[in-house]
């Protein structure tokens, strides 16, 4: 997908990134807001999960591990989901790095977004009160020769089985319960997501300790 293929409003909105200006001993320094938050070990996933977004988030995770391999990373998710392979790249990187990754759902975590939410550090997976979570089985289309369609259908079934196993690992539900829940689009409130094991706590305030401003 190119920029031309995307919704013009989405492109316009994503280009409006606030800048933060800080005073230092060497003068003023300006950062875009996401770079400034990255300094505080905060990563954002907003919008669909596709390859470019996945690469950026994986790079941020690896960078923060290189800076401090034990300090927690906060991963905020507001996503309708997207490409399975791109989402699994983020998930695998979250599990690969040594840093604990806390996840926070703001707005929505649907499809692959919900898997990333559930894949956070156990005990540190949160959702805001009005967040929505949606889980379902992977979908896809196939075209070409009958043998090619058969191969693609078999691949989707393999992916579905793997996703079910990941959800089972992180929720504590049985495989049968996972399969039943993911059979169709299942929309969950924050409390329902907690009961199902996708998150650990519904929060109204930032669960992380803050450092008082010395000024």
UniProtKB/Swiss-Prot annotation:
One GO BP annotation of this record: protein quality control for misfolded or incompletely synthesized proteins
Keywords, ordered alphabetically: Cytoplasm, Hydrolase, Protease, Serine protease
InterPro entries referenced in this protein's UniProt entry, alphabetically: ClpP, ClpP/crotonase-like_dom_sf, ClpP/TepA, ClpP_His_AS, ClpP_Ser_AS
Top-level EC class as recorded in UniProt: hydrolase
Subcellular location(s) per record: Cytoplasm
Entry keyword Hydrolase: yes
PROSITE patterns: CLP_PROTEASE_HIS (PS00382), CLP_PROTEASE_SER (PS00381)
Claim: Cytoplasm is one of the keywords in the record: yes
Gene3D superfamilies the record matches: 2-enoyl-CoA Hydratase, Chain A, domain 1
Pfam families the record matches: CLP_protease (PF00574)
Function: Cleaves peptides in various proteins in a process that requires ATP hydrolysis. Has a chymotrypsin-like activity. Plays a major role in the degradation of misfolded proteins.
Protein name: ATP-dependent Clp protease proteolytic subunit 1
Species this protein is from: Gluconobacter oxydans (strain 621H) (Gluconobacter suboxydans)
């Amino acid at each position: 997908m190119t920029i031309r293929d995307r919704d013009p409003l989405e492109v316009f909105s994503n280009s409006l990134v606030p800048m933060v200006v800080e005073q230092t001993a060497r003068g003023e320094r300006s950062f875009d807001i996401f770079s400034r938050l990255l300094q505080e070990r905060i990563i954002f996933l907003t919008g669909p999960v596709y390859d470019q977004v996945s690469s950026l988030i994986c790079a941020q995770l690896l960078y923060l591990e290189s800076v401090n391999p034990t300090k927690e990373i906060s991963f905020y998710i507001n996503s309708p989901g997207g490409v399975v392979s791109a989402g699994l790249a983020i998930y695998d990187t979250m599990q690969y790095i040594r840093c604990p990754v806390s996840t926070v759902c703001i707005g929505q975590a649907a499809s692959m977004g919900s898997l990333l939410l559930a894949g956070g550090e156990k005990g540190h997976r949160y959702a805001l009160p009005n967040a929505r979570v949606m889980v379902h089985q992977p979908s896809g289309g196939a075209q070409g020769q009958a043998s090619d369609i058969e191969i693609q259908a078999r691949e989707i079934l393999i992916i579905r089985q793997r996703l079910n196993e990941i959800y089972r690992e992180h929720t504590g539900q049985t495989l049968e319960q996972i399969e039943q829940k993911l059979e169709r689009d299942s929309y969950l409130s924050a409390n329902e997501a907690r009961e199902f094991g996708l998150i650990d706590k519904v929060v109204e305030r930032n669960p992380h300790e803050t450092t008082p401003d010395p000024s």
